[in-house]
């Protein structure tokens, strides 16, 4: 049976994650209140931040930055955007 959550990011009821995606309290909050759809949107945003900012994930500061961005994306005012990113136009 599919687990449904009231998604804090999307503001609607949607399919929940199968397991906490991160360790600790933040992972628990995401598991309890974020949908699969919103998590997939975060993975795309996270990839852009890593690539555009050339983050080295072996660097603890880069990992800490991403954890803060994760929390802001789901529960705050929104994560940073990649500087200079222009979304492709639909032609």
Curated annotation (Swiss-Prot):
Keywords: Iron. GO terms for molecular function: iron ion binding. Disulfide bonds: none annotated. The keyword NAD does not apply. It holds the Pfam family Iron_traffic. HAMAP family: Fe_traffic_YggX (MF_00686). PANTHER family: FE(2+)-TRAFFICKING PROTEIN-RELATED. This is Probable Fe(2+)-trafficking protein. It comes from Paraburkholderia phytofirmans (strain DSM 17436 / LMG 22146 / PsJN).
């Amino acid at each position: 049976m599919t687990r449904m959550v009231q998604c804090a990011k999307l503001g609607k009821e949607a399919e929940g994650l199968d397991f906490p995606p991160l360790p600790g309290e933040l992972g628990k909050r995401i598991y309890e209140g974020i949908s699969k759809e919103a998590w997939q949107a975060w993975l795309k945003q996270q990839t852009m931040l890593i690539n555009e900012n050339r983050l080295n994930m072996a660097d603890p500061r880069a990992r800490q930055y991403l954890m803060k961005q994760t929390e802001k994306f789901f529960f705050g005012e929104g994560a940073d955007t990649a500087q200079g990113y222009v979304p492709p136009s639909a032609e």
